[in-house]
Swiss-Prot record:
Interacts with EGFR; EGF promotes the interaction with EGFR. Interacts with PTK2/FAK1 and BCAR1. Tyrosine phosphorylation is critical for these interactions. Interacts with Rho GTPase-activating protein DLC1 and with the regulatory p85 subunit of the PI3K kinase complex; in resting cells, interacts (via C2 tensin-type domain) with DLC1 but, following growth factor stimulation, TNS3 is phosphorylated which leads to weakened interaction with DLC1 and enhanced interaction (via C2 tensin-type domain) with p85 while DLC1 interaction with PTEN increases. GO terms for cellular component: cell projection; focal adhesion; podosome. The gene is Tns3. Expressed in brain, heart, lung, liver, spleen, kidney, stomach, small intestine, skeletal muscle, skin, thymus, testis, uterus, placenta, aorta and trachea. This is Tensin-3. Residues 1-170 form the Phosphatase tensin-type domain. May act as a protein phosphatase and/or a lipid phosphatase. Involved in the dissociation of the integrin-tensin-actin complex. EGF activates TNS4 and down-regulates TNS3 which results in capping the tail of ITGB1. Increases DOCK5 guanine nucleotide exchange activity towards Rac and plays a role in osteoclast podosome organization. Enhances RHOA activation in the presence of DLC1. Gene3D superfamilies: 2.60.40.1110, Pleckstrin-homology domain (PH domain)/Phosphotyrosine-binding domain (PTB), Protein tyrosine phosphatase superfamily, SH2 domain. Residues 1167-1277 form the SH2 domain. Its EC number is 3.1.3.-. Keywords: Cell junction, Cell projection, Hydrolase, Phosphoprotein, Protein phosphatase, SH2 domain. The keyword Ion transport does not apply. One of its GO terms (molecular function) is phosphoprotein phosphatase activity.
Length: 1440
């Protein structure tokens, strides 16, 4: 049958068609037959067929067929386990979308690949077996038995059996580390005359060579077995192939003795035994003895197995270690892609120009990326890296389902599973899980690799059983970033896990030699995935059939139908979705510069205001996926805890940070009924449910197992995560965007637990079907807008109840940005992330050693268009870019306190209003003259969640790209004479409270021109000038100007009697009155960017303290916690205990006396440097004026702070001891200890020093009067680091040292290394390049990872074509420069600049070697690398 020269088209079932072409048929015959088949399919099925191409990718096949998935793998081989799941999922998804859909399985060559797909899908559909599918399964079984089974290879059958066992639950996954020590051949094949054999082994992991043995020469005595020792032992994980060759005697050819493929998850114990019938190639080769067997011996550690010394030597067998022979090194799988496509699953692409080895530049699609870290072939003596993913991360999960999804059936939807089927699936899913990795997904017709999901570059290194060939290699070192790597992505010896799938304790026909295995997952399966990839929910299939099919499933129709909205009707008990924007961090060149971070969260109550995610097309920025996504627990924590957390809606997983490529096809969303982030609910209900849901869950769980083994694995998306529409990055933002987000599910009292959503806004970029975009003219970038909308009226909402006092936590309101790109919805450009520990080289300026603070010109926001929550459903939306800043954790069920109401906060609708709360959000509220469209009985509610309550700052942010400037808040009120106006560019507030709420009369309308801003009703006019006698702000006055209802807690902040703070930062006028509420007894207002502080006291309580809070438990954040500007608040709260204030009502109109609010710039970012040392503080201050100071974290006293200040003259004791005048400069910097006590912070050892509520208060007071200090403090107006960098070359050198300590890395082309004798300088680079250009044959070039650190330059061959790793210490690197003649190097694209560095030849004191490189990424020029090496690495030791 295989030798037939005609095509074979078979209807396996009515909807599954198998089309095969023999490999021997001519190209002309193939094309002719292909055209006939295409015409027949189009005539009979129209465009309702999907082609699964199991062979190599072909342009003509793509051209003739509208929908095609290239999922091929090498002929006669087994596919990776994840690819089998991908194909099954694609079939199931396509066939369930439309009854008219059919699947065409295309294969040119051996039909064994068709057999793999048919049999896998047969087992796959058996998971949710139904009577109507029984006939199809029978037809597939008959086709398999009659036509295909005999044509399949043993490894193909082994993989099908393994998948069947996993799906049925008959097999368990083994995640124990497996180190291969021996491959023993029982029975010697007879390949040469006289029965001789010269075998050698090659080990492949994810189709990448990881080990090559020496050549074993079997003597004439012909021993009964050959023991091939694997030295060092190889850690194998995932899809493994062992291929044994025979090297012909006196011939440059080799024959395959046997080939076997298996998955490490199926290995039980530490031994495998394969008979001849289980070996590919050997099963049909008469030269392999019938009694022959192959035995694999594993262990859990790389150390030699005790008692196995006799296995290392065989009499009559000699080993040739000449593995430099090209025949031995040749990888037959290296050039499987004829068109030069990437032969691996692309790793995370963060747009970073200098991604680490395990990443890949977004601009280069032809160069495979490589895993980062030490390869498995490293010497086993690195004991600190011998723990594998499974053994050190604790990823054992309870046998519980991690996804609790609610799906509502619509008329016409497929029936759900029966309870019995549900129980079976529960059993199946007890250990499976899926969490999408950040692998970039391929387009259906434009995949980067025809072996997607199977090709992970695992650097190949030829290892021999000895010390040969070491003279050709330079030092192999461990990457100094290894300790910082998440071991979830690096195996026990540093090898990045390749494409691996589930593991089992049973391997089908394998004969297990040992079963004494300590399973790490005895009660479940690993469910973690690659680090920082949590929730990158990309609905495509990893191979292109993404939104086209999933959208049809969601909508129950074709792609022309709109997306199914993701928010259910109010009547459906839906878990609350909370939305969070990024928590980003920016590494700066100077280590002392503070990181800027911001958290933005929001939540909506069930039946009340709901937060949605806008999916309509907008020009303003980044797309954000809808929040209706099930969460799977993160890696990093105990998986058992994570599973329980996922089921019980406990604490949410930590924020994840995901990377987003710079350019992309931009999807078109057609849901025109979505406005301002609130999805309108149609009458059709929610997404249809079907057995697909359960299979989706099964595949999710199965893929989680694969990801447990291989963090780089590209999972198979399912319907569950298809709802999470991936975001795309705007073209103009740049390639360094990092986007992440978070969905927090908050359960209030009486609300049924639901699933948590974790939905990064920046998810992995997806390329959608070209056919889906043929009518997309606009091709605009989407931006998700968030807003509040009334989803319904709950007459008796069971939402709010105050927490008990002991549940009080701190919630930080972070209003940033330092990079004001957030104004238009973009994420600040950050090339460094938690995933990229080594930053890229600085480009512009070429080598900045001190990063200056950004300066932002002021701007005035336009007049916002405000809309009520109900109006959001009617298509109205605010003009501003809404970004909700809040942080919700959970609802306390304490039954105390009144029903909370909404705290409204709107920016004044005046063009001249100076916006302070940067990047704040527009909340839907009643604008002037607008009616509330919600029923009169509805009460606008916004509830502060306890125990971690939140005040949300809601304002209007400008959609333009102009950054936010400094703004002034000046009051014309008569109650604030003499108080100055201060500037503030970024404000941050932190509140301790039970409940911050504000009542609003039903149906109330705000007066024209007034808007509530942070609870202060600010009356504005066209010119922002108030009439005489009016104050600028009102404290806690609702939009109608009426007082809150009795018993409603009030937000009142200020300083009543603050003797130490004459300049009150937030002043409440003495005449302001407020209601007293017990719920506010423990409310605290403080600076979030301050050290741990105690609770503050009321003015009327004297010295009585409401309670002491230790620094470690108070919840206060220190100044370096991420904010650069803060709102300083006094250390004494308004006195609520005075009867006069309790009795006096709030003013009823803006004409009454109002509260005056003053803001002042927080300068803590200038004087608080947490991580600097005592010596660095001295260096910063010794040339400053007396009174200059720095506050830092004390290194000697944990939890305390050190105050270093410059004084005019040193103390007399110092003058007496130090007679030398030269020593006095350092003695002029004096050091004081600031201790943290339950009462506050104070200078230690000074009896006349009072306690202060914050560091800011202490500093401010001492800037007014010195108290116990030698002189008053001078509050700086700019960062002293910048000043020193400008004035002192020594500090620049220190900054360079810090920069070098941080290191920089990139990928470059390695061209050649040329010996230069003693020549150095530009001449050496010029001569080396000239010699390279004329060299015949030209030297082989390859992509290497080029890392510069304090240790020197480290080169890692991404594919190990030329070497593994080379290290050049700092002391050996002499010179680095561009080619003086500016010659370019051309390699499959635009020309690149050439640079090189000169280093001492190893073992020589005079000879030099020039190493040449070329730019790999044009956006990262060679000049940046040269500058870094020359000025930072080579230059810094000379300066310091």
């Amino acid at each position: 049958m295989e030798d037939s020269h005609e095509l074979d088209l078979t209807y396996v079932t009515e909807r599954i068609i198998a089309v095969s072409f023999p490999a021997s048929c001519s190209e002309e015959s193939y094309l002719h037959s292909l055209q006939e088949v295409t015409r027949m399919l189009k005539c009979k099925h129209g465009d309702n067929y999907l082609v699964l191409n199991l062979s190599e990718k072909r342009y003509d096949l793509t051209k003739l067929n509208p929908k095609i998935m290239d999922v091929g793998w090498p002929e006669l081989h087994a596919p990776p386990l994840d690819k089998m799941c991908t194909i099954c999922k694609a079939q199931e998804s396509w066939l369930n979308n439309d009854p008219q859909h059919v699947v065409v399985i295309h294969c040119r060559g051996g039909k064994g690949r068709i057999g793999v797909v048919i049999s896998s899908y047969m087992h796959f559909t058996n998971v949710s077996a139904s009577a109507d599918q029984a006939l199809d399964r029978f037809a597939m079984k008959k086709f398999y038995d009659d036509k295909i089974s005999a044509l399949m290879e043993p490894s193909q059958k082994r993989y099908v059996q393994f998948l069947s066992g996993l799906l049925s639950g008959a097999m368990k996954m083994n995640t124990s580390p497996l180190f291969l020590h021996f491959v023993i051949m029982h029975g010697v094949p007879s390949f040469d005359t006289g029965g001789a054999c010269r075998p050698f082994l090659k080990l492949y992991q994810a189709m990448q060579p990881v080990y090559t043995s020496g050549i074993y020469n079997v003597g004439s005595e012909n021993p009964s077995r050959i023991r091939i020792a694997i030295e060092p032992a190889q850690l194998l994980k995932g899809d493994i192939m062992v291929k044994c060759y025979h090297k012909k005697f006196r011939s440059a050819t080799r024959d395959v003795i046997f080939r076997l493929q298996f998955h490490t998850g199926a290995v039980q114990g530490y031994g495998l035994l394969f008979g001849k019938e289980e070996l590919d190639s050997a099963c049909k080769d008469d030269r392999f003895p019938d009694y022959g067997k192959i035995e694999l011996v594993f262990s859990a550690t790389p150390e030699k197995i005790q008692g196995s010394e006799h296995l290392y030597s065989d009499q009559g067998v000699t080993v040739d270690y000449n593995t430099a022979d090209p025949l031995i090194r040749w990888d037959s799988y290296e050039n499987m892609s004829a068109d030069g496509e990437v032969l691996h699953t692309q790793g995370p692409v963060d747009g970073s120009l200098y991604a680490k080895v395990r990443k890949k530049s977004a601009s280069d699609t032809g160069i495979p990326s490589s895993p980062q870290g030490m390869p498995a072939t490293s010497s086993p003596d690195h004991g600190d890296h011998t723990l594998s993913v499974s053994s050190d991360s604790g990823h054992s999960t309870a046998s519980a389902r991690t996804d609790k999804t609610e799906e509502r059936l619509t008329p016409g939807a497929r029936r759900g599973l029966s309870p019995q089927e549900k129980a079976e699936l529960d059993q199946l899913l007890s250990g499976f899980g899926l969490e999408d990795s950040a692998s970039s997904h391929k387009d259906m017709t434009d995949m980067r690799s025809k072996y997607s999901g199977t090709r992970h570059v695992v650097p190949a290194q030829v290892h021999v059983n000895g010390d040969a060939a070491l003279k050709d290699r330079e030092t192999d070192i461990l990457d100094d970033e290894m300790p910082h790597h998440d071991l979830h992505s690096v195996d026990s010896l540093g090898t990045l896990s390749s494409s691996e799938g589930p593991q089992s304790t049973h391997l089908g026909p394998f004969t297990c030699l040992k079963s004494s295995q300590n399973s790490l997952l005895s009660d479940g399966f690993g469910n973690g995935v690659a680090e920082d990839h949590n929730g990158v929910l990309s609905p495509d299939l990893g191979l292109g059939v993404d939104t086209l099919y999933d959208r049809e499933r969601m909508c129950g129709g074709r792609e022309q139908k709109p997306l199914q909205p993701l928010l259910r009707k109010p009547s459906a008990p839906t878990p609350v979705q909370a939305y969070g924007q990024s928590n980003y961090s920016t590494q700066t060149w100077v280590r002392q510069q503070q990181m800027v971070a911001a958290h933005q969260y929001s939540f909506a109550s069930d039946g009340e205001a709901r937060l949605g995610s806008r999916s309509t097309v907008d020009n303003t920025g980044l797309a954000q996926p809808p929040p209706h996504i099930p969460v799977t627990p993160n890696r990093g924590a105990s998986s058992r805890v994570a599973v329980q957390r996922g089921i019980s809606n406990g604490p949410n997983p930590p924020d994840t940070q995901q990377l987003c490529p710079g350019k992309a096809l931009q999807p078109r969303f057609q849901d025109d009924r979505v406005t301002n982030g609130v999805h309108q609910e149609p009458n059709t209900g929610s997404s249809p449910g079907s057995p697909t849901l359960d299979i989706d869950q099964s595949i999710e769980q199965l893929n989680r197992l694969i990801l447990e083994l291989d963090p780089t694995f590209e999972p198979i998306p399912t319907h569950l995560n298809a709802l999470g529409i991936s975001a795309v990055c705007p073209d103009g933002v740049g390639s360094g965007l990092r986007c992440s987000g978070r969905l927090d599910s908050v359960d209030g009292p009486g609300r049924s637990p639901g699933r948590q959503g974790d939905d990064p806004i920046g998810g992995r970029l997806r390329k959608l079907s070209i056919g889906q975009y043929d009518n997309d003219a606009a091709s605009q970038v989407t931006f998700s807008k968030c807003g509040w909308g009334k989803a319904g009226v709950d007459p008796a909402p069971s939402l709010g109840s105050f927490s008990s006092p002991e549940d009080i936590k701190e919630t930080v309101i972070t209003a940033y940005p330092s990079d004001l790109n957030m104004i238009d919805g973009r994420i600040p450009n950050s090339k460094e992330s938690s995933m990229c520990l080594t930053p890229s080289f600085p480009v512009s300026p070429e080598t900045p050693y001190v990063k200056t603070s950004p300066r932002y010109p002021p701007f005035s926001p336009p007049e916002p268009q405000l809309s009520s929550p109900a109006s959001l459903h009617k298509g109205r939306e605010p003009r501003g870019c809404p970004e909700i800043i809040s942080h919700t954790v959970g609802m306390s069920e304490s039954p105390v306190g009144p029903k909370p109401t909404m705290l409204r906060a709107d920016m004044p609708a005046t063009p001249n209003f100076q916006q302070v709360f940067a990047s704040s959000c527009t909340v839907s509220s009643n604008g002037p003259g607008q009616r509330r469209e919600s029923p009169p009985s509805a009460e606008r509610q916004w509830v502060e969640s306890s125990p971690k309550s939140t005040l949300t700052l809601l304002g209007n942010s400008h959609p333009s790209e102009s950054p936010l400037g400094t703004h002034e808040f000046c009051s014309s009120g008569k109650d604030s004479p003499g108080l100055p106006c201060f500037q503030s560019s970024e404000l941050q507030a932190s509140f301790h409270s039970h409940e911050l709420s504000m009542s609003e009369p039903q149906g109330a309308l705000p007066p024209a021109g007034s808007q509530t801003f942070l609870g202060f009703n600010t009356v504005t006019t066209a010119t922002s000038v108030l009439p005489p006698g009016e104050d600028a702000g009102t404290l806690l006055v609702n939009s109608h100007g009426t007082s809150p209802a009795p018993g409603t807690p009030l937000l009142t902040t200020g300083a009543a009697d603050n003797g130490f703070l004459p300049h009150n930062f937030l002043t409440v006028s003495p005449g302001a009155s407020s209601h007293h509420s017990p719920g506010l007894q423990n409310q605290n207002v403080s600076l979030p960017g301050q050290p741990p502080l105690p609770e503050k006291k009321r003015a009327s309580e004297g010295d009585r303290s409401l309670g002491s809070v230790s620094p470690s438990s108070s919840g206060f954040s220190s100044p370096h916690s991420g904010s650069t500007m803060s709102i300083p608040f006094p250390n004494v709260l308004p006195d609520f205990c005075k009867p006069s204030e309790v009795a006096s009502p709030l003013p009823d109109s803006p004409n009454d006396k109002l509260v005056i609010v003053k803001f002042v710039q927080d300068t803590s970012k200038f004087w608080y440097k947490a991580d600097i040392s005592r010596e660095q503080a001295i260096a910063m201050l010794k040339d400053k004026a007396p009174g200059s100071f720095i506050v830092r974290d004390s290194h000697s006293f944990r939890g305390a702070y050190g105050l270093a200040m410059k004084v005019a003259t040193p103390p007399p004791s110092v003058l007496h001891l130090n007679k030398k005048a030269g020593d006095l400069s350092n003695e002029l910097v004096r050091h004081f200890l600031i201790e943290c006590t339950p009462k506050g912070v104070r200078l230690k050892g000074c009896s006349n020093e009072p306690y202060f509520g914050s560091l800011t208060a202490l500093v401010c007071q001492h800037s007014i009067t010195p108290l116990a200090l030698p002189c008053k403090l001078l509050i700086p107006e700019r960062d002293p680091l910048e000043e020193i960098a400008e004035n002192s070359p020594q500090t620049a050198a220190n900054s360079a040292a810090e920069l070098l300590k941080q290191g920089a890395a990139c990928n470059v082309w390695y061209l050649n290394s040329v010996e230069m004798e003693s020549l150095t300088g530009h001449q050496a680079v010029q001569k080396a390049l000239s010699m390279t250009l004329v060299q015949e044959p030209p030297p082989v070039s390859t992509v290497v990872h080029f890392k510069v650190s304090a240790q020197g330059i480290t080169l890692t061959d991404n594919q190990r074509k030329l070497f593994f790793r080379r290290h050049y210490p700092v002391s050996s690197v002499i010179f680095c420069a561009l080619d003086p003649q500016d010659r370019k190097w051309i390699k499959d694209g635009p020309s690149s600049k050439v640079f090189g560095f000169v280093a001492r030849k190893q073992g020589s004191a005079t000879d030099n070697v020039c190493h040449l490189f070329a730019e790999h990424d044009p956006e990262q020029p060679a000049s940046a690398i040269v500058n870094f090496v020359s000025k930072v690495m080579i230059g810094s030791p000379k300066k310091i």
